Amino acid sequence: LGLTTLSTKYISLNSKYTGEASILAIIMMIFGVAILTMNQVSLKSRKNYTTVTGKSGQLSKMNLGKVGKYAIAVVMIILTFFTSIFPIFSFALETFLPNPGDYSFLYTKDLSNLTTKWWITKENITENGMYGQHGILYNSTIWHAFAGTLLVAVCCALIAGTIGTLIGYAVAKNRRSRWASYVNGVAFLPYLMPSIAVGAAFFILFSNEKINLFNTYTLLIIAGTIKYIPFASRSALNSMLQISNEIEEAAIIQDIPWTKRMFRIIIPIQKSAIISGYMLPFMTCLRELSLFLLLCTQGFILSTTLDYFDEMGLYAFSSAINLILIVTILIFNTLVNKLTGASLDDGIGGN
């Protein structure tokens, strides 16, 4: 339709018209704060349900009937195929095409048109569209960026998840306090700001003569942690509100210290929700581009490396990076599921 949004307009203005871009960022924040205020007002009279059994959720089953059961199953299968399976297959197939978008082998049925040059080329070849790049398996730029991405994502997840869990616990225990509402609102504030605006703010703050952290993992971790705290704090708060105070009060009567209460009582009861508070920042950080675009050079992490290869026209490399990110997320989610029994497959917080 050729329409623009505030966020896309902000990106187009940010490079040349920083003043106008800052005004747009403030407008977007005002909209976000207004929505958050409306949400808080609407939930003032909400009912709270707590648990004293150690189980924070329940499954409610509904009889869909024979027709409804199969109809919903077919719709879900189709949606899953086009939103999950087909994109992964497309990314994988793109890395074997001789030229971007060349699917001629489908109607010629000649698989010899497919190539593995994008994966296994070891030399700096300038012809065949490689632009002097090694294949994906031997490309040090990609794997160095992958290692850096994992480092940033793990650190952001650990720090943001821990801070968010503590915020959720503190707010839940002092839910009737005005300060608790203030802390909860401030913790959620970074979510209301556009990622590119947060990145620009950290660029101005930490890329100057006195403090220069540009193109360092430290700056990316700081920015990522601040941006992703709302994910962890919201997940932790919702889970902590479900725990009855009587559970912890019984432990306090027994003179059990706070750390032991957390690790032996609170965390085991809400294990799924707390782990979700760590997994959400981790997965978001892996694919983040807007936040880190101004804070590091191309090739420093995978998302900026993907942008670099897109500009070069090496779309097979971009597809491979997308595939690497997807597989990495699936592997980590599976490992967490197997090791802890908690997974995002069952929704935020699990069953």
Give a label for each model feature.
Residues L1-T4, S56-Q58, D102-N113, M130-G135, ...:
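Membrane-interfacial helix termini and adjacent extracytoplasmic/periplasmic loops
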Residues L1-V33, G65-K69, T95-F105, L111-M130, ...:
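Interhelical loop and adjacent transmembrane-helix boundary motif
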Residues S22-L64, A170-V171, L237-E246, I252, ...:
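C-terminal transmembrane helix and the adjacent membrane-cytosol boundary/short C-terminal tail
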Residues L24-S42, G135-V171, Y182:
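Transmembrane alpha-helix signature in integral membrane proteins
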Residues I30-F31, F81-I85, V186-S195, L219-P230, ...:
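Hydrophobic transmembrane alpha-helices
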Residues V33, T37, A157-Y169, K173, ...:
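Hydrophobic positions within alpha-helical transmembrane segments of bacterial inner-membrane proteins
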Residues Q58, G65-V75, L166-F202, G350-N351:
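Cytoplasmic-entry segments and transmembrane alpha-helices of multi-pass inner-membrane transporters
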Residues V74-I88, L189, I226, S233-A236, ...:
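Transmembrane alpha-helices
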